[in-house]
Amino acid sequence: MQKLKQQVFEANMELPRYGLVTFTWGNVSAIDRERGLVVIKPSGVAYETMKADDMVVVDMSGNVVEGEYRPSSDTATHLELYRRYPSLGGIVHTHSTHATAWAQAGLAIPALGTTHADYFFGDIPCTRGLSKEEVQGEYELNTGKVIIETLGDAEPLHTPGIVVYQHGPFAWGKDAHDAVHNAVVMEEVAKMAWIARSINPQLNHIDSFLMNKHFMRKHGPNAYYGQK
Protein backbone atom coordinates (compact mmCIF):
# COMPACT_ATOMS: atom_id res chain seq x y z
CA MET A 1 0.00 0.00 0.00
CA GLN A 2 3.00 2.29 0.31
CA LYS A 3 2.95 3.13 -3.39
CA LEU A 4 -0.75 4.07 -3.26
CA LYS A 5 -0.19 6.10 -0.09
CA GLN A 6 2.54 8.04 -1.88
CA GLN A 7 0.26 8.67 -4.86
CA VAL A 8 -2.57 9.88 -2.63
CA PHE A 9 -0.19 12.10 -0.66
CA GLU A 10 1.14 13.67 -3.87
CA ALA A 11 -2.39 14.18 -5.18
CA ASN A 12 -3.44 15.87 -1.94
CA MET A 13 -0.43 18.16 -2.16
CA GLU A 14 -1.57 19.25 -5.61
CA LEU A 15 -4.69 20.85 -4.11
CA PRO A 16 -2.94 23.83 -2.46
CA ARG A 17 -0.53 24.02 -5.41
CA TYR A 18 -3.45 24.66 -7.77
CA GLY A 19 -5.28 26.95 -5.37
CA LEU A 20 -8.18 24.58 -4.74
CA VAL A 21 -8.02 24.57 -0.95
CA THR A 22 -7.72 26.99 1.95
CA PHE A 23 -6.32 25.64 5.24
CA THR A 24 -7.42 21.96 5.35
CA TRP A 25 -10.59 22.30 3.24
CA GLY A 26 -10.12 19.34 0.95
CA ASN A 27 -9.26 15.69 0.58
CA VAL A 28 -8.18 13.15 -2.02
CA SER A 29 -8.56 9.38 -1.92
CA ALA A 30 -7.72 6.42 -4.13
CA ILE A 31 -8.85 2.80 -4.10
CA ASP A 32 -7.05 -0.52 -4.44
CA ARG A 33 -9.91 -2.58 -5.83
CA GLU A 34 -8.10 -5.92 -5.61
CA ARG A 35 -7.56 -5.51 -1.88
CA GLY A 36 -10.78 -3.61 -1.21
CA LEU A 37 -8.88 -0.81 0.53
CA VAL A 38 -9.00 2.97 0.22
CA VAL A 39 -6.23 5.45 1.04
CA ILE A 40 -7.43 8.90 2.09
CA LYS A 41 -6.12 12.10 3.65
CA PRO A 42 -6.25 12.29 7.46
CA SER A 43 -8.84 14.63 8.96
CA GLY A 44 -7.74 18.18 9.72
CA VAL A 45 -4.01 17.68 9.16
CA ALA A 46 -2.26 20.72 7.68
CA TYR A 47 -0.76 20.35 4.22
CA GLU A 48 2.44 22.05 5.37
CA THR A 49 3.30 19.23 7.76
CA MET A 50 1.61 16.26 6.10
CA LYS A 51 3.65 13.25 4.98
CA ALA A 52 2.92 10.18 2.87
CA ASP A 53 2.94 8.01 5.99
CA ASP A 54 0.13 10.15 7.42
CA MET A 55 -2.31 8.84 4.82
CA VAL A 56 -4.97 6.58 6.33
CA VAL A 57 -5.96 3.19 4.91
CA VAL A 58 -9.56 2.09 5.45
CA ASP A 59 -11.59 -0.89 4.33
CA MET A 60 -14.85 -0.55 2.40
CA SER A 61 -16.77 -0.31 5.67
CA GLY A 62 -14.65 2.63 6.83
CA ASN A 63 -12.62 0.72 9.41
CA VAL A 64 -9.05 1.97 9.78
CA VAL A 65 -6.59 -0.78 8.88
CA GLU A 66 -3.44 1.35 8.75
CA GLY A 67 -2.56 4.82 10.01
CA GLU A 68 -2.17 6.85 13.19
CA TYR A 69 -4.81 9.47 12.38
CA ARG A 70 -8.54 9.51 11.88
CA PRO A 71 -9.48 9.48 8.19
CA SER A 72 -11.14 12.45 6.50
CA SER A 73 -14.61 13.27 7.78
CA ASP A 74 -15.80 12.81 4.19
CA THR A 75 -14.63 9.19 4.03
CA ALA A 76 -18.17 7.76 3.98
CA THR A 77 -18.98 9.86 0.90
CA HIS A 78 -15.92 8.55 -0.93
CA LEU A 79 -16.70 4.94 0.00
CA GLU A 80 -20.29 5.18 -1.16
CA LEU A 81 -19.16 6.44 -4.57
CA TYR A 82 -16.52 3.72 -4.90
CA ARG A 83 -19.12 1.07 -4.07
CA ARG A 84 -21.55 2.35 -6.67
CA TYR A 85 -19.18 3.16 -9.55
CA PRO A 86 -16.49 0.53 -10.30
CA SER A 87 -14.79 2.79 -12.87
CA LEU A 88 -13.71 5.28 -10.21
CA GLY A 89 -10.11 5.06 -9.04
CA GLY A 90 -9.74 8.40 -7.25
CA ILE A 91 -12.02 11.01 -5.67
CA VAL A 92 -11.46 14.64 -4.66
CA HIS A 93 -13.52 16.99 -2.52
CA THR A 94 -12.69 20.69 -2.19
CA HIS A 95 -14.34 24.00 -1.44
CA SER A 96 -12.73 25.75 -4.41
CA THR A 97 -14.21 29.22 -4.77
CA HIS A 98 -16.07 29.24 -8.07
CA ALA A 99 -17.33 25.67 -8.09
CA THR A 100 -18.53 26.14 -4.51
CA ALA A 101 -20.30 29.35 -5.52
CA TRP A 102 -22.36 27.38 -8.07
CA ALA A 103 -23.10 24.80 -5.37
CA GLN A 104 -24.27 27.50 -2.98
CA ALA A 105 -26.41 29.03 -5.72
CA GLY A 106 -27.97 25.61 -6.30
CA LEU A 107 -27.17 25.64 -10.00
CA ALA A 108 -25.49 23.25 -12.39
CA ILE A 109 -22.31 24.60 -14.01
CA PRO A 110 -23.47 25.13 -17.59
CA ALA A 111 -21.58 23.77 -20.57
CA LEU A 112 -20.87 26.98 -22.47
CA GLY A 113 -17.72 26.26 -24.44
CA THR A 114 -15.11 23.83 -25.65
CA THR A 115 -12.93 23.96 -22.53
CA HIS A 116 -15.85 22.50 -20.60
CA ALA A 117 -16.67 20.00 -23.36
CA ASP A 118 -13.11 18.67 -23.43
CA TYR A 119 -13.72 17.14 -20.00
CA PHE A 120 -17.43 17.13 -19.17
CA PHE A 121 -20.14 15.80 -21.46
CA GLY A 122 -22.85 18.32 -20.63
CA ASP A 123 -23.57 20.47 -17.61
CA ILE A 124 -21.87 19.65 -14.32
CA PRO A 125 -24.96 18.82 -12.24
CA CYS A 126 -25.98 20.18 -8.87
CA THR A 127 -27.61 17.81 -6.42
CA ARG A 128 -30.76 18.49 -4.47
CA GLY A 129 -30.37 19.64 -0.91
CA LEU A 130 -30.22 17.11 1.86
CA SER A 131 -33.19 16.93 4.21
CA LYS A 132 -32.93 17.69 7.91
CA GLU A 133 -33.17 13.96 8.60
CA GLU A 134 -30.41 13.19 6.10
CA VAL A 135 -28.11 15.79 7.65
CA GLN A 136 -28.81 14.80 11.24
CA GLY A 137 -28.46 11.11 10.39
CA GLU A 138 -25.50 9.68 8.49
CA TYR A 139 -24.62 12.99 6.85
CA GLU A 140 -21.52 11.99 4.89
CA LEU A 141 -23.04 8.71 3.73
CA ASN A 142 -26.17 10.56 2.63
CA THR A 143 -24.03 13.06 0.73
CA GLY A 144 -22.73 10.13 -1.29
CA LYS A 145 -26.26 8.84 -1.79
CA VAL A 146 -27.54 12.19 -3.11
CA ILE A 147 -24.63 12.33 -5.57
CA ILE A 148 -25.56 8.84 -6.79
CA GLU A 149 -29.22 9.84 -6.96
CA THR A 150 -28.25 12.75 -9.23
CA LEU A 151 -25.88 10.79 -11.47
CA GLY A 152 -28.01 7.68 -11.70
CA ASP A 153 -26.72 5.14 -14.20
CA ALA A 154 -24.68 7.67 -16.20
CA GLU A 155 -21.02 6.84 -16.81
CA PRO A 156 -19.31 8.94 -14.11
CA LEU A 157 -16.11 9.38 -16.13
CA HIS A 158 -18.13 11.21 -18.81
CA THR A 159 -19.13 13.78 -16.20
CA PRO A 160 -16.27 13.49 -13.73
CA GLY A 161 -17.63 15.90 -11.15
CA ILE A 162 -20.66 17.34 -9.42
CA VAL A 163 -21.54 20.15 -7.05
CA VAL A 164 -23.47 19.27 -3.91
CA TYR A 165 -26.11 21.87 -3.09
CA GLN A 166 -24.98 24.33 -0.39
CA HIS A 167 -21.78 22.33 0.08
CA GLY A 168 -19.21 22.13 -2.70
CA PRO A 169 -17.64 20.16 -5.53
CA PHE A 170 -16.65 16.51 -5.75
CA ALA A 171 -14.57 15.26 -8.67
CA TRP A 172 -13.27 11.84 -9.63
CA GLY A 173 -11.16 10.03 -12.18
CA LYS A 174 -9.29 6.86 -13.10
CA ASP A 175 -6.83 7.50 -10.25
CA ALA A 176 -6.06 10.15 -7.66
CA HIS A 177 -4.07 12.42 -9.99
CA ASP A 178 -6.74 12.19 -12.70
CA ALA A 179 -9.36 13.16 -10.13
CA VAL A 180 -7.34 16.23 -9.10
CA HIS A 181 -6.91 17.15 -12.77
CA ASN A 182 -10.69 17.07 -13.19
CA ALA A 183 -11.18 19.11 -10.02
CA VAL A 184 -8.85 21.79 -11.39
CA VAL A 185 -10.74 21.86 -14.67
CA MET A 186 -14.08 22.06 -12.86
CA GLU A 187 -12.92 25.11 -10.93
CA GLU A 188 -11.68 26.77 -14.12
CA VAL A 189 -14.87 26.15 -16.13
CA ALA A 190 -16.97 27.26 -13.15
CA LYS A 191 -15.07 30.55 -13.21
CA MET A 192 -15.41 30.84 -17.00
CA ALA A 193 -19.16 30.18 -16.84
CA TRP A 194 -19.64 32.82 -14.15
CA ILE A 195 -17.71 35.41 -16.17
CA ALA A 196 -19.41 34.51 -19.46
CA ARG A 197 -22.91 34.67 -17.97
CA SER A 198 -21.99 37.99 -16.31
CA ILE A 199 -21.00 39.39 -19.71
CA ASN A 200 -24.02 37.92 -21.49
CA PRO A 201 -26.86 36.70 -19.22
CA GLN A 202 -28.72 35.33 -22.28
CA LEU A 203 -25.78 33.17 -23.35
CA ASN A 204 -26.88 29.79 -24.67
CA HIS A 205 -25.25 26.43 -24.03
CA ILE A 206 -22.56 25.19 -26.38
CA ASP A 207 -23.96 23.70 -29.59
CA SER A 208 -24.40 19.96 -29.18
CA PHE A 209 -22.41 19.12 -32.31
CA LEU A 210 -19.45 21.14 -31.05
CA MET A 211 -19.68 19.61 -27.58
CA ASN A 212 -19.82 16.12 -29.07
CA LYS A 213 -16.78 16.79 -31.24
CA HIS A 214 -14.62 18.08 -28.42
CA PHE A 215 -15.57 15.39 -25.94
CA MET A 216 -15.34 12.48 -28.37
CA ARG A 217 -12.00 13.49 -29.88
CA LYS A 218 -10.50 13.11 -26.38
CA HIS A 219 -12.64 10.37 -24.84
CA GLY A 220 -14.53 8.56 -27.60
CA PRO A 221 -13.73 5.16 -29.14
CA ASN A 222 -11.89 6.87 -32.00
CA ALA A 223 -10.20 9.56 -29.90
CA TYR A 224 -7.25 11.23 -31.58
CA TYR A 225 -6.26 13.99 -29.13
CA GLY A 226 -2.75 13.69 -27.71
CA GLN A 227 -0.13 11.00 -28.21
CA LYS A 228 -0.50 7.24 -28.06
Curated annotation (Swiss-Prot):
<dbReference type="InterPro" id="IPR023499">
    <property type="entry name" value="UlaF"/>
</dbReference>
<dbReference type="GO" id="GO:0019323">
    <property type="term" value="P:pentose catabolic process"/>
</dbReference>
<keyword id="KW-0479">Metal-binding</keyword>
<comment type="similarity">
    <text>Belongs to the aldolase class II family. AraD/FucA subfamily.</text>
</comment>
<feature type="binding site">
    <location>
        <position position="74"/>
    </location>
    <ligand>
        <name>Zn(2+)</name>
    </ligand>
</feature>
<feature type="binding site">
    <location>
        <position position="167"/>
    </location>
    <ligand>
        <name>Zn(2+)</name>
    </ligand>
</feature>
<dbReference type="GO" id="GO:0016832">
    <property type="term" value="F:aldehyde-lyase activity"/>
</dbReference>
<dbReference type="GO" id="GO:0019854">
    <property type="term" value="P:L-ascorbic acid catabolic process"/>
</dbReference>
<dbReference type="InterPro" id="IPR036409">
    <property type="entry name" value="Aldolase_II/adducin_N_sf"/>
</dbReference>
<comment type="pathway">
    <text>Cofactor degradation; L-ascorbate degradation; D-xylulose 5-phosphate from L-ascorbate: step 4/4.</text>
</comment>
<feature type="active site" description="Proton donor/acceptor">
    <location>
        <position position="118"/>
    </location>
</feature>
<feature type="binding site">
    <location>
        <begin position="72"/>
        <end position="73"/>
    </location>
    <ligand>
        <name>substrate</name>
    </ligand>
</feature>
<dbReference type="GO" id="GO:0005829">
    <property type="term" value="C:cytosol"/>
</dbReference>
<dbReference type="GO" id="GO:0008270">
    <property type="term" value="F:zinc ion binding"/>
</dbReference>
<keyword id="KW-0413">Isomerase</keyword>
<dbReference type="GO" id="GO:0008742">
    <property type="term" value="F:L-ribulose-phosphate 4-epimerase activity"/>
</dbReference>
<comment type="function">
    <text>Catalyzes the isomerization of L-ribulose 5-phosphate to D-xylulose 5-phosphate. Is involved in the anaerobic L-ascorbate utilization.</text>
</comment>
<keyword id="KW-0862">Zinc</keyword>
<dbReference type="InterPro" id="IPR001303">
    <property type="entry name" value="Aldolase_II/adducin_N"/>
</dbReference>
<protein>
    <recommendedName>
        <fullName>L-ribulose-5-phosphate 4-epimerase UlaF</fullName>
        <ecNumber>5.1.3.4</ecNumber>
    </recommendedName>
</protein>
<feature type="binding site">
    <location>
        <position position="95"/>
    </location>
    <ligand>
        <name>Zn(2+)</name>
    </ligand>
</feature>
<keyword id="KW-0119">Carbohydrate metabolism</keyword>
<feature type="binding site">
    <location>
        <begin position="43"/>
        <end position="44"/>
    </location>
    <ligand>
        <name>substrate</name>
    </ligand>
</feature>
<dbReference type="Pfam" id="PF00596">
    <property type="entry name" value="Aldolase_II"/>
</dbReference>
<feature type="active site" description="Proton donor/acceptor">
    <location>
        <position position="225"/>
    </location>
</feature>
<dbReference type="InterPro" id="IPR050197">
    <property type="entry name" value="Aldolase_class_II_sugar_metab"/>
</dbReference>
<feature type="binding site">
    <location>
        <begin position="26"/>
        <end position="27"/>
    </location>
    <ligand>
        <name>substrate</name>
    </ligand>
</feature>
<feature type="binding site">
    <location>
        <position position="93"/>
    </location>
    <ligand>
        <name>Zn(2+)</name>
    </ligand>
</feature>
